[in-house]
C-alpha cells in the first residue's frame, strides 16, 4: 500500500490554472524530488498536499485513508485541518522560527501544545514535558546543534536556523516530510550542511518530498524525480532516467540550464 496517493489535484488562483490534474503515489521510505522552472506549480502542489492550500479538485490519501476530498464541499474546521496536517512535517525556504523563543522552545512548542489534549496531561505534565524536551535534545544532537539549545534565532546562521526548522518538523513525528526549496535562502557555503541533514534522513528511510533547484542533490538522494512544467507532471522517473535519458524536449532544455 502506498503511504501517499495524490489524485487529480487541481488548483487555480483567479483565472490562473496553477495545477492541472496532478497524479502520483509514493511508498514508505521513498524520496521524491520535484524539479522544474519557477512558476511550474511545484510549491503550490506541496502546499495542497499538506493542506496549507485547499485544492479545487482531487484527493489526498495517507496509508490508504482519504484525508482530503475536494468533492466534499463542507469546510474543514481548524481542528480537522490541523489533524490532517500532522501527517506532514513542513520545512520552508524561509525558516519561520519564532524569534522570541530559544532553539529548544521553538522545537518543543508544538508538541507541548498537542500534549495538552492527552487524558493524562494534568497528572503527568512534568514527565510528558521532560520526554518532549529529551526528544528535542536528541534531534539537536543529530543536527550538530546541541550547544545552541538556549540560543535565539538571531544568534544563528541561516544554515543553523534551517537545521532547527528541520528538527522542529521532526519533533512532531510526521509520516512524511515536505521540503520547499530548503536551501534557496542560504549562501552556497551553508547549503551543504542542510543538504547533509536531509541526506541523513533519507539514509534512515524517512519518507520525503523535496522541491529543489539543487539538481546534483536531487540526483543523489532521490528514488524518483518528478519534472513539472506548466502545472502538470511533464516527466517522471528514476534519477538515472530523468537526468541521464530525458525524453521530452522541455526537460532537456531545463536540464541544459541546470547545474548537475
Regions found by a protein language model. Name each.
Residues 152-156, 160:
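Conserved ABC ATPase signature
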Residues 177-180:
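Catalytic Walker B motif of ABC-type/P-loop ATPase nucleotide-binding domains
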Residues 188-190:
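Helix N-cap at the start of a conserved alpha-helix in ABC-type nucleotide-binding domains
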Residues 236-237:
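ABC ATPase "signature
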Amino acid at each position: 500500500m502506498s503511504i501517499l496517493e495524490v489524485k487529480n489535484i487541481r488548483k487555480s488562483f483567479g483565472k490562473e490554472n496553477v495545477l492541472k490534474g496532478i497524479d502520483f503515489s509514493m511508498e514508505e521510505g521513498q524520496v521524491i524530488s520535484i524539479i522544474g522552472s519557477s512558476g511550474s506549480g511545484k510549491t503550490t502542489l506541496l502546499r495542497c498536499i499538506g493542506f496549507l492550500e485547499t485544492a479545487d479538485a482531487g484527493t489526498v490519501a495517507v496509508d490508504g485513508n482519504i484525508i482530503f476530498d475536494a468533492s466534499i464541499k463542507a469546510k474543514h474546521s481548524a481542528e480537522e485541518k490541523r489533524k490532517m496536517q500532522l501527517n506532514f512535517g513542513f520545512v520552508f525556504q524561509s525558516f519561520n522560527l519564532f524569534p522570541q523563543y530559544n532553539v529548544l522552545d521553538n522545537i518543543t512548542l508544538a508538541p507541548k501544545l498537542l500534549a495538552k489534549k492527552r487524558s493524562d496531561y494534568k497528572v503527568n505534565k512534568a514527565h510528558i514535558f521532560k520526554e518532549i524536551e529529551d526528544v528535542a535534545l536528541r534531534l539537536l544532537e543529530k543536527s550538530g546543534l546541541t550547544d545552541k539549545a538556549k540560543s535565539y534565532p538571531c544568534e544563528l546562521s541561516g544554515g543553523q536556523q534551517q537545521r532547527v526548522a528541520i528538527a522542529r518538523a521532526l519533533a512532531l513525528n510526521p509520516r512524511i516530510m515536505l521540503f520547499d526549496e530548503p536551501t534557496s535562502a542560504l549562501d552556497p557555503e551553508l547549503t551543504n550542511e542542510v543538504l547533509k541533514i536531509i541526506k541523513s534522513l533519507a539514509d534512515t528511510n524517512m519518507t520525503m518530498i523535496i522541491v529543489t533547484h539543487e539538481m546534483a542533490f536531487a540526483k543523489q538522494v532521490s528514488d524518483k524525480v518528478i519534472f513539472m512544467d506548466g502545472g502538470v507532471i511533464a516527466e517522471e522517473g528514476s534519477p538515472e532516467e530523468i537526468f541521464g535519458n530525458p525524453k521530452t524536449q522541455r526537460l532537456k532544455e531545463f536540464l541544459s540550464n541546470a547545474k548537475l
